[in-house]
Regions:
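C-terminal lobe and adjacent flexible extensions of AdoMet/dcAdoMet transferase-like proteins
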Residues: 355-502
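Class I S-adenosyl-L-methionine
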Residues: 306-314, 318-387
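N-terminal auxiliary segments of SAM/dcSAM-dependent transferases
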Residues: 2-32, 39-134
């Protein structure tokens, strides 16, 4: 038996064995004999026996209750980050046929199409193991730009459209706002927003698109206008291209600032640690916006990018802003990426989903380029405007205490953001999650079978719970109603607070 199994076995209460019952019986007789020898009234003897009987009855009740999962907390699913149900049908169609749209704008001949997988593979090396050889304006090269759009832009649209369609409305710009897309490339973010949020199509938005590659922005604007033309009832957003690096001045203050994968590229081009870089990024973001500006930052789900976002999160909170997602609290980040990016095997904040629903043609292209994707991962941060001081101070002291307290009371609710795939602990399904308690280990009552599948037992009595035929997934936000706060333990391996759910 492994050390981990031994550890988790402590939390499984078992009925007393025959040997244990006999041992208890002997102890009880000994107590009786000892009591009879003491020169005390018969009342005291009866009291001792009564206490002993009550203690044993309580222990039996605890074991009985635990076996019925009465210690497990009820919960319900508030939202998911990657549900395909929220992606508009016209967006799904465009994603499926994205290669045809690109071909209609910048056509390749048969020979170039045949060479495309190899060109994609070469570009992949420049973005990863050979990035030190990559030119800053690499997307100005037509071959590399074509490869990038037909592969990376397509995958990024799949990732971003999935995320954007599931974020709350307050994460996005409002009517007539000035918006800034930093490191815009071929306008991937703008296209993803148009696809994922149909309600934004009717808004008159002005977009400043900032990038060092003018060629990629021109290509991206052609792509966006072609896609927007499929909804002729809406006027396309105004696009203002600005050639320059992050920090280049724009003419107006932005009410909405967004970037995708930009910070990761900047980190790759610098030897400075994220702690130093994040300070510079924050100052520049603040310079571009106002106190009312919203931010939406999306990066690859790698430790260093996660660390950068965590540092920015801290600064945004210190400035009085609110985090819309993914954080279910405003406490210190328990998965800040510091130990992970420095080489330790620690959890960092990132979310993933299966690519089985990705366009078939994109999956086939990935296989030809020998870059198959089974999962798509990302880290992100959605930030709203600074909190009004009067509004902030109007909260009662009791409300503030509840928000900031790490102590759980019976009947309180605890929001948890699932931040891992499921794994097995003591033959039960478990997940890592983020909550105001810090790193949290969510244990369900689903048992693992020998074939690796998950079975759910005895849930007919708990119809109010989430449909147990569908497992929780990375990115899900759940609200747990606390029944028994006193029994919460800490995971020996990670220190995570253990929360059992039914």
């Amino acid at each position: 038996m492994s050390e981990e199994q031994k550890f988790y076995q402590k939390f499984t209460q078992k009925k007393a064995s025959k040997k244990e019952k006999q041992s208890f019986s002997k102890k009880e007789k000994s107590i009786k004999q000892h009591s009879s020898q003491i020169c005390q009234s018969g009342t005291k003897t009866k009291t001792t026996q009564s206490k002993q009987h009550t203690f044993q009855e309580n222990q039996n009740n605890k074991n009985k209750n635990y076996s019925k999962n009465d210690y497990a907390n009820d919960y319900h699913l508030q939202n998911s980050l990657f549900s395909t149900k929220n992606i508009p049908s016209d967006a799904k169609k465009i994603l499926e046929d994205f290669d045809q749209i690109v071909q209609s704008i910048r056509p390749l001949n048969s020979r170039q199409i045949q060479q495309l997988p190899d060109n994609i593979k070469m570009l992949s090396h420049q973005l990863t193991d050979k990035r030190s050889e990559r030119r800053l304006g690499y997307l100005n090269d037509n071959i590399q730009l074509s490869s990038y759009v037909r592969y990376y832009t397509w995958w990024n649209l799949v990732r971003l459209t999935r995320l954007f369609s599931n974020l709350p409305e307050e994460s996005f710009p409002q009517e007539n706002q000035i918006c800034l897309d930093c490191g815009t490339g071929p306008l991937t973010v703008i296209i993803a927003l148009w696809l994922a949020r149909p309600e934004l199509r009717k808004h008159k938005l002005t977009w400043y698109c900032l990038d060092v590659s003018a060629n990629s922005m021109i290509f991206g604007e052609d792509l966006y206008l072609t896609i927007a033309a499929k909804n002729p009832e809406f006027e396309p957003w105004k696009i203002i291209r600005v050639k320059g690096a992050f920090g280049t001045q724009i003419k107006q203050k932005a009410g909405f600032i967004i970037c995708a994968n930009m910070l990761n590229e900047l980190n790759q081009n610098s030897d400075m640690p994220p702690e130093y870089q994040a300070k510079k990024y924050f100052q520049q973001f603040e310079a571009y916006g106002t106190a009312q500006t919203k931010f939406l930052l999306v990066e690859p789900g790698v430790p260093k990018a996660s660390r950068t976002l965590s540092l920015l999160r801290t600064r945004f909170l210190e400035e009085g802003r609110s985090i819309v997602a993914p954080c279910p609290h405003a406490q210190e980040c328990p998965m800040n990426g510091f130990k992970a990016y420095t080489g330790s095997s620690h959890k960092w904040c990132n979310f993933a989903f299966s690519t089985e629903d990705a366009p078939i043609k994109l999956q086939k292209l990935s296989e030809k380029a020998k870059l198959p994707k089974e999962r798509a991962t990302l880290s992100f941060l959605s930030v709203t405007e600074k909190i009004n001081i009067e509004k902030k101070n109007s909260k009662s002291l009791e409300d503030k205490d509840d928000e900031n307290s790490k102590e759980l009371k019976r009947g309180q609710t605890l929001k948890c953001r699932i931040a891992s795939d499921y794994f097995i602990v003591d033959k039960k399904q478990a997940f890592y999650a983020c909550s105001k308690l810090g790193l949290t280990l969510i244990r369900t009552q689903a048992k693992s079978q020998s074939n690796g599948k998950i079975s759910y037992q005895n849930y007919t009595e708990k119809e109010e719970c989430l449909d147990k035929n569908n497992s929780l997934t990375s990115g899900d936000l759940i609200e747990v109603k606390i029944k028994t706060p006193a029994i919460h333990q800490n995971d020996e391996k990670t220190g995570a607070v253990i929360v059992d759910i039914c």
